[in-house]
Amino acid sequence: MLVISANEQRNLVNMNEVIEYAALALKEFSAERTITPIRDSLPFANEQNTALIMPSVAEGLEALGLKVVTVVPENKKIGKKTINGIVMLSDFQTGEPLALLEGSYLTMIRTGALSGVATKHLARHNAKTLCIIGTGEQAKGIAEAVFAVRDIEKVILYNRTEEKAYAFSQYIQEKFNKPAYVYTSANEAISEADIIATTTNASTPVFSKKLQKGVHVNAVGSFRPSMQELPSHAIANATKVVVESKEAALEETGDLQVPIQEGLFKSSDIHAELGQIISGEKAGRESDEEVTVFKSVGLAVVDIIVAKYLYERAVERGVGERIEF
């Protein structure tokens, strides 16, 4: 079995390729060619933390794997990662353990790639300004993926802890050579944006202002019914609301459950799964005036396909540590 660390994965990744693999996984899922159960969400430590168990089989892509991650928001106070985990791949023919990959970096890259796919199909082609609300680790993958599919000229940042936003601003400028500005108001930050990404652990909406015409939103933070990043009117008034999996999104996120409970949105109002747009079954953006929202909760098959991509790259380059059971 090959063990692949976060640093080794970092040196293997080409974001454009990861976006392509994520799109392939989404397309297979929406065509019902995978077995991807709704993940098990296990609260622990008085429900402050969450363990997520995510298996998937993709027959046509010959991929089989399991992801286990923990989300511990308070870790950031002690300088530790809020997301920790592993992804295990099995040999599709023999069932033998094939690889074990560090899971937090893979999650960050996968999360970014999902937003990259959504941005490619749902954001205006002339989008130039990206606003990111929440500047933790997941924001790094989102920024890189959005930069891969749109010619972004300006980045606007908002974070509840301002120092972290300034640190992220420096990261954007140094790694991508793009100007990044820190705002002290989330409402002001979104007012100038063509693309908005929310990646927080918020239980109440992170902004209140109405979305402007033509904007696209990637909302990736809310993965439990008790979490809500977007105000209900953002979902209710959107031209198109798109998800990875209708079943998973309706069960797992307060971003949809709250407006449904308030009578502002119905499950039938979901425009499409992202895989249906990729395949051409459903339309993506159709005009520059549309307001589009991609509500992401994560999807195990995407993790497994991205893990397979990383494994194949590692084998090609002789990267990773082989261990025997």
Curated annotation (Swiss-Prot):
Pfam families: OCD_Mu_crystall. Its EC number is 1.5.1.49. Gene3D superfamilies: NAD(P)-binding Rossmann-like Domain, ornithine cyclodeaminase, domain 1. Keywords: NAD, NADP, Oxidoreductase. It is an enzyme of class 1 (oxidoreductase). GO terms for cellular component: cytoplasm. It catalyses: L-proline + NAD(+) = 1-pyrroline-2-carboxylate + NADH + H(+); L-proline + NADP(+) = 1-pyrroline-2-carboxylate + NADPH + H(+). It comes from the Bacteria. InterPro entries: NAD(P)-bd_dom_sf, ODC_Mu_crystall, ODC_N. One of its GO terms (molecular function) is oxidoreductase activity. NCBIfam families: PRK08618.1. Catalyzes the reduction of Delta(1)-pyrroline-2-carboxylate (Pyr2C) to L-proline, using preferentially NADPH over NADH as the electron donor. Is likely involved in a degradation pathway that converts trans-3-hydroxy-L-proline (t3LHyp) to L-proline. PANTHER family: KETIMINE REDUCTASE MU-CRYSTALLIN. Belongs to the ornithine cyclodeaminase/mu-crystallin family. This is Delta(1)-pyrroline-2-carboxylate reductase. It comes from Bacillus cereus (strain ATCC 10987 / NRS 248).
